[in-house]
Amino acid sequence: MNPALKALGLGNFKLPSRNWTIFWTVLAGSLGGVGYDKYQQRQIISRYCDEVKPLSLQHCDVNKSPRKITVFIAPPPNDYLETSLKIWRRYIKPVLYYAGLDYEVIEEDRQGIIRSEVASRIRQLRRELLEADNEQQGNSGDSLLSIFKKPHAKDPEEEQKFDPEQARQFKADFDFRNVMGIYTKVPKLDTIVQTDSLVADPVLAGGVVCVGRGAYKEYITGLHEGLLGPLDPPEETTQEVEMGSKLKSMNDGDNVETTVETAVETMVETTLESADKVEVEGKDTENEEGKDEPDEEKSRVLKPYLLRTAFHDTPIPPEVEPVLEKDALLKDPKTNVPSLLHQPVLVIPVPNLIGFLTIPERIYRFYQRRFFVDEVCREASNLVKQEHIVKYEPDKHINLALEEESDWPKQWVKTGIEKNSEWTQELVQDQRVVSKMHVFELPKHTTKDTKE
């Protein structure tokens, strides 16, 4: 025994036993693999953030808003929304933040919200276009008719009448700096101009990010519904049809009036019972906040205006005919920003395996997470720099993030097919609509070289 170790009171060093050696080796390897993967993830995110950081240092006038990205996030099937939000918050949002870009996030807690949101935005643009066209025609008509009109004296009582709409408009437009003139210390800013409205090529305006295959499916369907569908929702005729069926089943004769009265009384009693039930439930939940909407209201809000089976047979509405048949642009009349139809799309898959039998694959993916992070951050960097934008190819880009569907639970897919779920249905696309779209697509060799 070494005398020095003996003087210190230390015994002889011995190698650990076989079992302890196996234990510490497995533990060190497991923890080392996790630590290395997490370290590489931080390095990857930091590298791509540093690449786009110079863009945020560019000069921007105070009356201009930065480029705005629209983000649609959908949860993976049979799982929580937080799974998709982690991908957004950890890997996509930092790149957009350090690039100095603005973004708007639309989250979905049930199927149909993204489709309904996209379609409603397109319909709102169509309504504004129709209103602007009508106002222009009305103003031109007034200018022509004003030549034949003679000026007449105004009634003093009419001049003194109070117009609440005019008062609200005056209050909104009033600014003390216009009254004080040179005595104001803060100069008055001009109208805020969005950077997306100043680009020469509409493909370089804004951008759309779909996190999840389900979000991408609903986005495509929402574009078709908003452009080809009607402006007004389908009429709710459930109660009318029920009443009509009762009246049609009546027999002609002396009992017609009695039958009609009975049917009406039944409908009234049903309405009163439902109203009382709603009132009682409202009293019980009077002080609760964040209460979910009724199922009937949800289904009514998310009900499509146009079925996907009718996309190809639906004629193009006249207000969007120059957009779909010609090279005209669909822009917001107020901001002059190109619509979502012309903005390029980036699709990010959400890999998510659940179940006991998938544990080995989940463990492997857990230790290889850095490759997925590198791919997502590279796509986000390409979104910021706008380097690789290609025209939408129906046969190719309809399958974006298709690999995610292999992770969907088979039982969930089977149930979705039976219930006619939007995600399990085949994605329908019309050439008239998708021919105006663009997508972010990196070259294939770039991804391979990085992974190798």
Curated annotation (Swiss-Prot):
Report the record's Gene Ontology biological process terms: protein insertion into mitochondrial inner membrane
Q: Where is this region: Disordered?
A: 271-299
Q: What are this entry's molecular-function GO terms?
A: protein transmembrane transporter activity
Coiled-coil annotated spans: none
InterPro entries for this protein = Lipid_Phosphate_FormReg (IPR050187), Mt_import_IM_translocase_Tim54 (IPR021056)
Q: How does it sit in the membrane?
A: Single-pass membrane protein
- Give me the stretches of Acidic residues compositional bias: 286-296
Q: Topological domains (Mitochondrial matrix): residue ranges?
A: 1-19
Keyword hit for Aminoacyl-tRNA synthetase: no
Which residues lie in Basic and acidic residues bias regions? Answer: 274-285
Q: Which residues cross the membrane?
A: 20-36
User: Any S-S bridges, and between which cysteines?
Assistant: none
Q: Which compartments does it reside in?
A: Mitochondrion inner membrane
List UniProt keywords, sorted A-Z. Answer: Membrane, Mitochondrion, Mitochondrion inner membrane, Protein transport, Translocation, Transmembrane, Transmembrane helix, Transport
Which Gene Ontology cellular-component terms appear in the entry?
A: TIM22 mitochondrial import inner membrane insertion complex
Q: Which Pfam families does UniProt cross-reference here?
A: Tim54
Q: Which residues lie on this side of the membrane: Mitochondrial intermembrane?
A: 37-452
Q: How does it assemble?
A: Component of the TIM22 complex, whose core is composed of TIM22 and TIM54, associated with the 70 kDa heterohexamer composed of TIM9 and TIM10 (or TIM8 and TIM13).
What the record says about family reads: Belongs to the TIM54 family.
Function, in words: Essential component of the TIM22 complex, a complex that mediates the import and insertion of multi-pass transmembrane proteins into the mitochondrial inner membrane. The TIM22 complex forms a twin-pore translocase that uses the membrane potential as external driving force.
Can you say what this protein is called?
Mitochondrial import inner membrane translocase subunit TIM54
The source organism is Candida glabrata (strain ATCC 2001 / BCRC 20586 / JCM 3761 / NBRC 0622 / NRRL Y-65 / CBS 138) (Yeast)
